[in-house]
Swiss-Prot record:
Motif (DEAH box): 193-196
Catalytic activity: Couples ATP hydrolysis with the unwinding of duplex DNA at the replication fork by translocating in the 5'-3' direction. This creates two antiparallel DNA single strands (ssDNA). The leading ssDNA polymer is the template for DNA polymerase III holoenzyme which synthesizes a continuous strand; ATP + H2O = ADP + phosphate + H(+)
Protein name according to UniProt: ATP-dependent DNA helicase XPD
Organism: Thermoplasma acidophilum (strain ATCC 25905 / DSM 1728 / JCM 9062 / NBRC 15155 / AMRC-C165)
Substitution effect: K152A: 350-fold decreased ssDNA-binding, 2-fold increased ATPase, 3-fold increased helicase activity
Impact after mutating D564N: 10-fold decreased ssDNA-binding, 15-fold decreased ATPase, no helicase activity
């Protein structure tokens, strides 16, 4: 930290990365009058940080805030509006409007914006109890005080803030946040939790899409606000229909069965040809559509709604789409969800550049090979790798070559074989198990072929239901079906015997879709490593992340089997992986041996 703007550490699950980083960063920053920002991807990761801070608070004074955006922390917004899309700017306008009304004497405009925001009682709860964001939201509901404004008011006194990546990597939001905190970027130390996700996070923040569904919402909005003329004989709804027809025609003519990469200018070409108008005329209409959206926002603001407009969102995105960089972005056209076009970010280093203005600590159990991480994120910093620290005999990892999840061989017989192997293992070994599938589709097809009871992380499961399922799993034991790279792949702790076995029902290769093909081409052009950077390394990271769920202490034992004949190629990333011809018996015998060692000390 003293020699570089950042450091990177790979260390196994359970080795104490979080508490080490927290204590080091807090000590380093306190000596230099700096602050600490801990960035997380999920609520479960935030909860783990809060848990570690609570343990540290017995030996050092810690003032922490679990900061999140208004979308998650505004009680009033959830009560008065039900938008499918929202942005930070619109919600900030809504909030400021309500605050002005309260200060003008209309306390009913927002019953949560009151003197309690700055009260000693609220601040004591925040700094003494060290609540999670969810716990502080509940506190706000119970006590009729705004959680977001209370956090903002307490920010200047905070030593450390825990926040989502997306919150800080949004430049406009970050600048306001830092201003409220009273610090500049060079006055903070940033801890990047589960940093192997940083490339995907950067790409996600840098990407956007225009869908038929968003156009339908814009159309309904136009009808609700008078559908005025934008130009001679062209109403708002007419322009939206022009856009929708062009998008649907492109999807119909270009996509076939799946998504395709197009040129960014192709959409504008379709618009010109189908509507017999010049690009200049179309851009002028889009500018008028944006202005109409601003009118809608003002009208919503007058009646106390969130000033967000689907029309202005569509207009700004289409203009941005047409002007996008063909080198670092890919224009993707997809028939999914009714059809959409997407500007997919291929190079996240520009999005992540702002992090270099602060000291950074990059932590993960899977940063190696670091050249891959460094190339993609743009961070050329010192890297240290800590090897396995727990007894090797406590872990069994193998792959079974009797099945494969390869798409062109995955027929009904192969699915039957995979289901039979999974069922044999579950019924013979009888341990708490998560079965990870490469996709929801494969999970559904295998699930129909097994007879044992199990729980399931289905597509779109909400946080409350996920936590309820995990609580039942920990209490009653059993089996969960989940998806690789999903919410149960990382960031959730399973100490002791809460999780003893993992089955990877196929390798979690990236989907061979247009985005991943574009990533392959980009990395091949830039580094000559298209296959490694777009397929091999991301797959190896997912496998290692899932294996990392098993062992968290020297007393834990766990087994993992990969049901895919292609898994042998990943031995260089998992040196202790064996090959098995009878996974059920081999795993059963492993646990029998582990029990004998525990009983007799052998």
């Amino acid at each position: 930290m003293q020699k570089s703007y950042g450091v990177a550490l790979e260390s196994p699950t359970g080795s104490g990365k979080t508490i080490m980083a927290l204590k080091s960063a807090l000590q380093y920053s306190s000596e230099r009058k700096l602050k600490v920002l801990y960035l997380v991807r999920t609520n479960s990761q935030e909860e783990q940080v809060i848990k570690e801070l609570r343990s540290l608070s017995s030996t050092m004074k810690i003032r922490a805030i679990p900061m999140q955006g208004r979308v998650n922390m505004c009680i009033l917004y959830r009560m008065v509006d039900d938008l499918h899309e929202i942005n930070a700017e619109s919600l900030a306008k809504f909030c400021n409007m309500k605050k002005r009304e309260v200060m003008a004497g209309n306390e009913a405009a927002c019953p949560y914006f009151n003197f309690k925001i700055r009260s000693d009682e609220t601040k004591r709860f925040l700094f003494d109890e060290l609540p999670t964001a969810e716990e502080f939201y509940d506190y706000g509901e119970r006590n009729n005080v705004c959680p977001y404004e209370s956090m903002k008011a307490a920010l200047p006194d905070a030593d450390i803030v825990i926040a989502p990546y997306a919150y800080f990597l949004n430049r406009s939001v970050a600048e306001k946040f830092l201003s409220h905190w009273g610090v500049s970027r060079n006055q903070i130390v940033i801890i990047l939790d589960e940093a192997h996700n940083l490339p995907d996070i950067g790409r996600s923040i840098g990407s956007f899409r225009i869908s038929v569904e968003s156009l339908n919402r814009a159309d309904r909005e136009a009808q609700a606000y008078g559908d005025p003329e934008l130009s001679q004989k062209i109403h708002v709804s007419d322009l939206i229909e022009m856009i929708r027809s062009a998008l649907q025609s492109m999807v119909s003519e270009r996509c076939g069965k799946g998504d395709v990469r197009i040129r960014f200018q192709e959409f504008m070409e379709y618009m010109r040809i189908m509507n017999k108008r010049s690009e200049r005329e179309i851009r002028s209409l889009l500018n008028y559509l944006y202005l109409f959206g601003e009118y809608v926002e003002n009208e919503k603001e007058k009646v106390g709604k969130v000033p967000f407009s689907y029309c202005s969102s569509v207009a700004s995105r289409i203009i941005a789409f047409s002007d996008q960089d063909e080198e670092k972005y890919a224009a993707i056209l997809s028939p999914e969800d009714g059809g959409y076009m997407q500007a997919a970010c291929l190079d996240p280093s520009g999005i992540l550049e702002v992090l270099k203005e602060s000291k950074t600590i990059h932590m993960s159990g899977t940063l190696d090979p670091f050249d891959f991480y460094s190339d993609i994120t743009g961070f050329e910093i010192p890297f240290k790798k800590i090897g396995e620290i727990f007894p090797p005999e406590n872990r069994y990892i193998a792959y079974y070559d009797g099945v494969s999840s390869k798409y062109d061989t995955l027929d009904e017989k192969e699915l039957d074989r995979m289901a039979t192997v999974i069922e044999d293992i579950i019924l013979k070994v009888k341990k708490n198990t998560i079965v990870y599938f490469p996709s929801y589709s494969l999970m559904d097809r295998v699930e129909n072929r097994v007879s044992f009871e199990h729980m399931k992380e289905y597509r779109g499961i909400d946080q409350k239901e996920l936590y309820s399922m995990l609580k039942k799993f920990r209490r009653d034991h059993g089996t969960i079906f989940a998806v690789s790279g999903g919410r149960l792949s990382e960031g959730i702790n399973f100490p002791g015997n809460e999780l003893e076995m993992i089955i990877l029902a196929g390798l979690p290769f990236p989907r061979p879709d247009a985005i991943n093909r574009s990533l392959f081409d980009y990395y091949e052009r830039k580094y000559g490593k298209g296959w490694e950077y777009s397929v091999v390394y991301p797959t190896a990271i997912k496998i290692r992340q899932e294996i990392g769920r098993l062992i968290r202490s020297a007393e834990d034992t766990g087994a993992c089997v990969i049901l895919d004949k292609r898994a042998g190629q990943f031995r260089k990333f998992i040196p202790d992986m064996k090959k098995t011809s009878d996974p059920a018996s081999d795993i059963y015998n492993f646990f029998i041996s582990a029990q004998a060692r525990e009983k007799y000390g052998a």
